[in-house]
Amino acid sequence: MKIPGIKALTFDVGGTVFDWRGAIESEVQRLSDEQGADVDARQFATDWRIRMFKDLELVKSGELPPMNADALHRRALDEVIDKHGSLELSVSERDELNQIWHRMKAWPGAVDAIHKLREAYTTTVLTVLSYAIAVDCSKFNDLSWDGIMSCEFMDHYKIDPQAYQQGAKLLGHRPDEVMMVATHTVD
């Protein structure tokens, strides 16, 4: 089924296509079990994600220098580990944990659905995640896109309307010809 007037689909991937929570919880639980630490992996994952988005707001306001999601996640991780004090990780272990964002699994059915949608639409990523995260997770899940747009290369971050407008322009379409696909209402 083709939606009249829509030529391209831009996908949020962190949560919509890839299960960030499951990846983080699983890895934090594994590390916690190895250390015999008492860490609520679900809360840790939530705190990490929230802290990253708070830091992103500081980047957007100019209070922090420009940095991509890899650097934002790594910065946020230090604060979250301090909050969940029973998990002790060296700098190199923290760097390795930060790489879990590059190995998020796709939700069941997502890969097949996107491949099917590519038959009718240009399908791309439009994300605040880094280009490297989007590429690595796509490869990890054998997921092909027509393009990947990371806000790290744009002048604006989602949910700023100009990020969506710039994405449409990069695709050669008017904004009304591009549909954002996301599982949260802010997009």
Model-found features: residue ranges?
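Conserved Lys-Pro-Asp/Glu-containing loop-to-beta segment of HAD-superfamily phosphomonoesterases
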Residues: 157-186
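N-terminal helical cap/lid subdomain that shapes the substrate entry/recognition surface
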Residues: 3-108
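Substrate-recognition element of Asp-dependent hydrolases with the DxDx(T/V) motif
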Residues: 91-104, 110-140, 148-151
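Short alpha-helical
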Residues: 23, 105, 131-133, 186-187
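Short acidic capping loops at alpha-helix termini that bridge into adjacent secondary structure
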Residues: 41, 144-147, 174-179
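Conserved SAM-binding loop
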Residues: 17, 126, 180-181
